[in-house]
Amino acid sequence: MADWIFQADHPVDDEVTQQPEDWWNTPQHRDQIAVGDRVWLQISGRHNPGLYYIATVVRPVYESTERVDPNRPGFGRWRTDIRFEYRIVPPLLRSDLLKEPDLASFRPLRGFQGSNRPVPAVISSRLLELANLVPLTA
């Protein structure tokens, strides 16, 4: 099992509540993402950027013919399906994570690094120590 940070540029709270299993844009690392991998969802476009959810990959990466945004022709071409499992309460805010000596050098936490990035096991273990995970109910 691998760990990933997937990024959203906007809050997804309503989407998670209404549809706990959904596809996610995966233009990078598509040959490495596998069913069962853990996903840390980083929200970057809100007032308090940080890690807000944990999900699990439930379908291998696939190519979709559906085009989501005509202004971004490649967006949504490569996808994987994920199921949101936990809300992180309170969220692990970027500003707090960057104060942690063992996390401060992990580039994906410092800003936009693409839509999906691998997370080393040592980083994921530390994030799990810090996170208060609240299971999402269906």
Predicted regions and their residues:
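Contiguous surface segments at macromolecular interaction interfaces
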Residues: M1-I5, V12, Q18-Q28, S64-A138
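Short coil-to-beta transition motif at edge beta-strands of beta-rich domains
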Residues: R30-I43
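Short, charged beta-turn/beta-strand-edge "cap" motif at the junction between a beta-strand
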Residues: I43-P49
